[in-house]
């Protein structure tokens, strides 16, 4: 348990940031899952739209410092590869 006033404040700030970061991470994962679900039903146009929305969420998470740049780039590239393979298969 924190003893000093500043340490107590840091506990509150850390919890607030944890909740905020978790919300952003959840939103990013949800958008990625939407892309994958549109790929499974083979809906090319919906997959492209979902991919652009997912890109936006990944970029927001990077700008807020929640995800590292390379992590977001890797996940975006993998999603794009799956969408492109869907497009080329049809």
From Swiss-Prot:
Record flagged with keyword Ribonucleoprotein: yes
InterPro entries: Ribosomal_bS20, Ribosomal_bS20_sf
Keywords (A to Z) from UniProt: Ribonucleoprotein, Ribosomal protein, RNA-binding, rRNA-binding
Cysteine pairs bridged by disulfides in the record: none
Any one GO BP annotation for this protein: translation
Highest rank taxon of the organism: Bacteria
Entry's Gene Ontology cellular component terms: cytosol; small ribosomal subunit
GO molecular-function terms, A-Z: small ribosomal subunit rRNA binding; structural constituent of ribosome
Pfam name, any one: Ribosomal_S20p
Gene3D superfamilies: Ribosomal protein S20
Known role: Binds directly to 16S ribosomal RNA.
PANTHER family: 30S RIBOSOMAL PROTEIN S20, SMALL RIBOSOMAL SUBUNIT PROTEIN BS20C
Homology family: Belongs to the bacterial ribosomal protein bS20 family.
HAMAP family: Ribosomal_bS20
This protein's name: Small ribosomal subunit protein bS20
Species annotation: Fusobacterium nucleatum subsp. nucleatum (strain ATCC 25586 / DSM 15643 / BCRC 10681 / CIP 101130 / JCM 8532 / KCTC 2640 / LMG 13131 / VPI 4355)
Gene field: rpsT
